[in-house]
Amino acid sequence: MYQQPHTNVKTWRPVVLTAGLLFYTHPPANHIQIILKYITSMKQILTKITNGEVLTREQTCQIVRHIADGEYNDVQISALLTGLIMRGIKVDEVLGLRDGLIETGQPVDFSPYQVIDIVGTGGDNKNTFNISTCACFVVAGAGYKVAKHGNYAATSTSGASNVMEHHGVQFTADSNRLRRSMEACNFAYLHAPLFAHGMKAVAPVRKMLQIPTCFNLLGPLVNPCRPAYQLLGVANLNQMRLYSSVYEKLGIGYGIVNSIDGYDEISLTGNFKVKTNTMEKIFRPADLGLPTVRPEELYGGATPDEAAEIFDSVLENRSTESRKNVVLANAAFAIKVIERDKDIAECIAIARESLESGRALTCLKTYVELNNKNL
């Protein structure tokens, strides 16, 4: 018996792409207009991109809505992502994609708290230990509210989600449980795949392309709680310029850090640049009263278990001085983003007290205990 097919264009299998036209096997006659609507829409988008025109924030937001609703097929999404890669993505386009992912994702409300997220873009291929995740607990131990938005490792041995799972954390998207965690230990962990539904829709295409796309830039921008503050580590200065423009338009308190030798965090292996709402400066480790460290001292381990042991050693204040100092530096600049009037020496002292007093470790233990009890 004939059954009326639904109107999800993505399910109609493309058989040939030629002369700018995409043909499908036997689409229902009464759905021809739907096909033309989306092909025309994507054709207009791709024409703008190939002509060097910049899409508006609303246009790119609408693209994400269509992708999340399954209204574009994989060929169209692939063409879009490739076009943006070749032309280069612009600030308003990043903002629009970010808006769309936030809108189509699951929100988390931590108000009235003013929370901070500490995150790196990844992709620096340095395989460092979990510096930003350690810094999150140091900042939480100092009394600030931290909402860490993270995922499994992409290019390193262990990402934030790997470390959390090692400690028995069961990820949740339940706002009440996340809020109770924030209230109990100043920390909540937001496992990215549970929230960004739009990201799931492009995952197969990104996997097939096997090259970085504009969606690689969006991870740090789509924390579902929309933090008031963010410390972001980037791997190069071009990314620093792009993200700073995005943050300025979003109106949040930010700090962006880049180690000149390519780390997407403050590595203390040499000079590093910091850009905030009010300051842009190159620092030396000595400016913080800290020694320079060797790259091999930041090694993240060969296995997730080894990475978790390094993570624990830092928060238990039994790690090497180099690892400890790197975490203190990153935590201090996160505190500086929140406390603009404090100088960096004060912020380092606050971070050091949190770590050496055991308060950072207490935050971790409380968080894990609450999670394992399912709150």
Regions found by a protein language model. Give the residues of each.
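Positively charged N-terminal leader segments that act as targeting/secretion signals
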Residues: 4-28
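Short, Lys/Arg-enriched N-terminal segments with co-localized hydrophobic residues
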Residues: 24-41
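N-terminal glycine-rich anion-binding loops that anchor highly charged ligand groups
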Residues: 41, 49-95, 102-110, 326
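A glycine-rich phosphate/pyrophosphate-binding beta-strand-loop-alpha-helix module
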Residues: 81, 129-185
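Active-site cofactor/substrate anionic-group-binding motifs, chiefly glycine-
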Residues: 88-150
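Acidic, glycine-rich active-site loops and adjacent beta-strand->loop/helix elements
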Residues: 120-125, 150-156, 195, 260-261
